[in-house]
C-alpha cells in the first residue's frame, strides 16, 4: 500500500461512548519505488512442476490495476471475475491498460482455482460469490468474510488484534497503491465520500454500508468447491469469519472442507491437502477427496502439517463440559 502502520494515523478511541470521535489525520503517501508489483514465487515453485499455471492479478487500486480499492465493495468481486472471464475466452485482454496488443489465454483449460491469505484470502471468496463460470475451487486462508465483524461487534466498535484504532478507511490507506495520477480522485470519492461517511464509529450499528461488505449476504452465488483455512488463535481475523462461511456452504450443499490450526494469523493447509483439492477440481481427477473427513484440526502441541481428521466441524461426537473456577480469590485460580 501507500501508507504505513503508524498509529498516529489511526482513529483515536480515547473518547466518551456515543461521542463523535476525534478527526483522523490522513497519512502522507509512501513513494512508490517500483511500478511492477512484487509477487511471491512460492506458488510458482509449488504448482508449476505439477502442471498448473500460476496467474498473479492485482486487485483494483493496486499494482497496474485501474480503479480504486473499496475494501469489500462489488468492484473487488468483479475484478477477479473479469480475469477468470479472460482465462475462459469470454473477455478481451491486452498488453497494456490503454491499448496494446490483444492477449488470449489459449493455454488455459477453463478450470481456475484461487488461493490467498488475509486480504488476498478474501478475494477468492469475493470472486466465487459472483458465480463466475470456470472458478472451480478456492482456498481462502484467514479470509475477512465480513468487514462489520472485523471492525464492529454487536453494535460496538472493535479493532483487529494488534491494531488499536484501525478501521476500514485505515485499511484503504494501507491497500491503496495503484496509479498515482488517480490517487486524489480515489481518496476523495472512496475514502472520504464513502468509507468515512458511512462507517459510523458513533453507534457501531450494522447498516447498508456494512451489509454490502458481508460476503455471507452473497453466498448463494458460490458454486466453487471451498477449502476454508484458519487459525484458532488468530486475533486479527477471528476464526468466526471462516466458520460462518463453512456452515452456510454446508447448508447449500456446496463441496466444502475446513482446516484449523493452533497458530496465529495465516497458515495454509498442508500442501498435500491443497494439492488434492486443486487436483480434484481443476484436473477433474477422482482422488476421492469428497469421501475424506470434512474437517482437519491441528490439535494442541501437534505439528501444523499433521492435522487430525474429524467427520465435521464442530466434531459431531463432541459434548458440552461444565467448567467452574476454583481458588480462594487471592491469586490465580484454576478451572
What are these regions (language model features)?
Residues 4-33, 37-45, 49, 77, ...:
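Accessory cap/linker subdomain of secreted extracellular hydrolases
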Residues 235-241:
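Conserved alpha/beta-hydrolase "acid-adjacent" motif
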Residues 50-55, 108-112, 133-137, 223-226, ...:
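Loop/turn elements at helix/coil->beta-strand transitions in domains of secreted/extracellular proteins
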Residues 48-64:
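Conserved alpha/beta-hydrolase
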Residues 268-335:
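C-terminal, loop-rich substrate-recognition/catalytic regions characterized by aromatic stacking residues
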Residues 249-266:
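Catalytic histidine neighborhood in serine/cysteine hydrolases
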Residues 34-37, 63-82, 91-94, 265-270:
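Catalytic nucleophile-loop/oxyanion-hole region of alpha/beta-hydrolase
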Residues 222, 228-230, 234:
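Short beta-strand/loop motif that positions the catalytic acidic residue
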Amino acid at each position: 500500500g501507500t501508507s504505513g502502520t503508524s498509529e498516529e494515523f489511526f482513529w483515536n478511541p480515547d473518547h466518551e461512548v456515543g461521542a463523535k470521535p476525534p478527526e483522523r489525520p490522513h497519512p502522507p503517501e509512501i513513494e512508490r519505488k517500483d511500478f511492477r508489483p512484487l509477487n511471491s514465487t512460492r506458488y510458482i515453485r509449488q504448482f508449476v512442476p505439477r502442471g498448473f499455471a500460476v496467474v498473479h492479478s492485482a486487485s483494483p487500486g493496486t499494482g497496474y490495476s485501474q480503479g480504486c480499492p473499496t475494501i469489500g465493495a462489488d468492484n473487488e468481486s468483479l475484478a477477479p471475475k473479469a480475469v477468470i472471464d479472460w482465462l475462459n475466452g469470454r473477455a478481451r485482454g491486452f498488453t497494456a491498460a490503454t491499448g496494446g496488443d490483444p492477449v488470449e489465454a489459449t493455454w488455459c483449460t477453463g478450470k481456475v482455482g484461487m488461493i490467498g491469505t488475509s486480504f488476498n484470502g478474501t478475494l477468492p471468496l469475493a470472486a466465487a460469490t459472483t458465480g463466475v463460470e470456470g472458478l472451480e475451487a478456492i482456498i481462502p486462508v484467514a479470509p475477512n468474510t465480513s468487514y462489520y465483524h472485523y471492525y464492529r461487534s454487536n453494535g460496538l466498535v472493535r479493532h483487529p488484534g494488534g491494531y488499536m484504532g484501525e478501521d476500514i478507511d485505515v485499511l484503504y490507506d494501507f491497500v491503496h497503491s495503484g496509479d498515482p495520477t488517480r490517487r486524489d480522485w480515489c481518496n476523495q470519492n472512496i475514502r472520504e465520500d464513502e468509507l468515512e461517511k458511512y462507517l459510523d464509529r458513533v453507534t457501531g450499528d450494522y447498516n447498508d454500508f456494512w451489509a454490502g461488505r458481508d460476503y455471507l449476504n452473497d453466498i448463494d452465488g458460490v458454486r466453487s468447491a471451498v477449502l476454508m483455512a484458519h487459525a484458532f488463535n488468530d486475533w486479527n481475523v477471528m476464526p468466526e469469519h471462516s466458520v460462518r462461511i463453512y456452515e452456510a456452504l454446508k447448508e447449500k450443499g456446496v463441496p466444502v472442507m475446513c482446516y484449523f490450526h493452533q497458530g496465529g494469523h495465516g497458515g495454509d493447509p498442508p500442501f498435500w491437502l491443497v494439492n488434492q483439492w486443486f487436483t480434484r477440481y481443476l484436473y477433474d481427477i477422482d482422488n476421492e477427496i469428497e469421501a475424506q473427513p470434512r474437517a482437519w484440526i491441528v490439535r494442541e502441541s501437534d505439528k501444523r502439517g499433521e492435522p487430525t481428521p474429524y467427520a465435521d466441524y464442530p466434531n459431531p461426537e463432541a459434548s458440552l463440559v461444565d467448567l467452574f473456577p476454583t481458588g480462594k480469590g487471592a491469586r490465580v485460580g484454576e478451572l
